[in-house]
Amino acid sequence: MMTTLRLQTSAILLAGSIFNGGGAMAQEGPGQGYARIANGAYSVVAEVRAKPGKEAELRAITLPLIELVRGDPANLVYFLQENRETPGHFIFYEIFANEADFEAHNAMPYVQEWFAKLPDLAEGGVKVMRMQVLAPAGN
């Protein structure tokens, strides 16, 4: 529980400070990337765990999602993370402007192909928390 909470908190903090399509790096100026994310934007934190012995296979089919999702103009933020202590335990952090954009993303063929492979590779499917981005009062 505590590890999951730490992972989710790390995902949120990391995503909040990085808004480029490349690797992880600090923002160029204070708050520049935040202007792209509106109050109430549709945020998702998802979790998937590999079946024992399937960690490398799940990682191999999941890594290509980074470039594909970040290439979607409707995607505002996408981070894939793996638990350092439990290889094969992945946390996804995604932000879209609204639920319709997220559902359109889920309908993409590459996402559907990924979901179709999960029964052989993942324990219990994907656990998803659907959230909204909050901004300070006045924003």
Region roles according to the model:
Residues 52, 66-73, 106, 118, ...:
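Sec/Tat-exported extracytoplasmic proteins
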Residues 24-42, 80-86, 115-139:
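Glycine-rich beta-strand-turn "strand-cap" elements at beta-sheet edges
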Residues 34-60, 64:
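N-terminal targeting signals for Sec/Tat export/insertion, comprising classic cleavable signal peptides
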Residues 9-21:
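Bacterial N-terminal signal peptides
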Residues 1-11:
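Bacterial N-terminal signal peptides that target proteins for export
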Residues 33, 66-91:
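Short, glycine- and small/hydrophobic-rich beta-strand elements in well-ordered beta-sheets
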Residues 54-76, 110-113:
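Short amphipathic alpha-helical segments
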